[in-house]
């Protein structure tokens, strides 16, 4: 179970990411300051929600989906789930709506159920890189760190300079006790976007690093 402190950080990360692109799936990471564990895929990746524009999975930007994204950005997860569900009722092949609902569901406390939706989104549109990021985040919330890292790596295969996927891997290594790798990846993220410094300095992933000389140099403590 995620502690209150961690959840607040996760929520902050997601909200910051969402601010970049508007939701969990059509967003841009590298230019925005985001918290590291709750960033939505859309924001963090900067890829459009669907790379297969002519497929059945093509996202229908209906009012329910737009409202769901807005609710997700505001931290109103129950409303985001409700609106995304309404969007899915209108279009059962709406990959983006499944991804938004999955991420909102995970942030609302049911990561296992959220993972079902993000997997469904992947089945509908396997080319949606934004959903790769959401998958990584949902796995992370569920505590499946190796699986989470694999999905961050899938994002980086498409966008090697994706700040928050690089940072996400850094936090995973930190949580797994791989200190050198954690700092190596943190350094990579900071080189891409220096705003990562303030995020890392505040997040509990790196709390035990606050007396580490290299960490202090990297984040400016």
Question: What does each of the following model-derived ranges do?
Answer:
Residues 57-96, 100-103, 107:
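Alpha-helical segment of the N-proximal tetratricopeptide repeat
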Residues 100, 134, 168, 202-203:
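Canonical tetratricopeptide repeat
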Residues 20-22:
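C-terminal motif of bacterial Sec signal peptides marking the signal peptidase cleavage site
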Residues 27-53, 191-221:
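Terminal, low-structured helical/coil segments at or just beyond the last alpha-helical repeat
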Residues 74-83, 107-120, 142-154, 177-185, ...:
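Structural signature of tandem alpha-helical TPR/SEL1-like repeats
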